[in-house]
């Protein structure tokens, strides 16, 4: 996995949303997700994408990033904390956008795809597994970077991530 920096995506009244930008990549992870999902021609898939974007806005402006608003697909066995936006409380969709909820005020958006229908886990779905695995790896790296405090740390209020965009985080 390449080094990366965080990029601020949205600042809402309740939540700051960040994403990952890998060194050498043209797009951030979230921008790649939006571009790929935006190319879907199925009207239901377009509705699902719009619903995910609306959920981010609603969570960000109205509720805060409480865990009940995220789909718990955490892979505890592999020590990752990736979750998906949004939970079944907000919408029932096969679209998964993986993220790392650091607090009720800070979320890092990753990437995702449409999960295969049926009782199949994210770990076993060929479409979302690569995104889910990468998201879990990133949660561990980000948690470690926060713990180390060298390239990434909280501000005094624990509502803003402080980092230098010229100093990538090393996996």
Residues of each region from the PLM?
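Short acidic loop-to-beta-strand element that houses the catalytic metal-binding Asp/Glu
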Residues: 94-99
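Active-site beta-strand-loop-beta-strand hairpin of nuclease catalytic cores
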Residues: 100-109
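Basic, Lys/Arg-enriched alpha-helical interface segments
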Residues: 1-93, 116-171
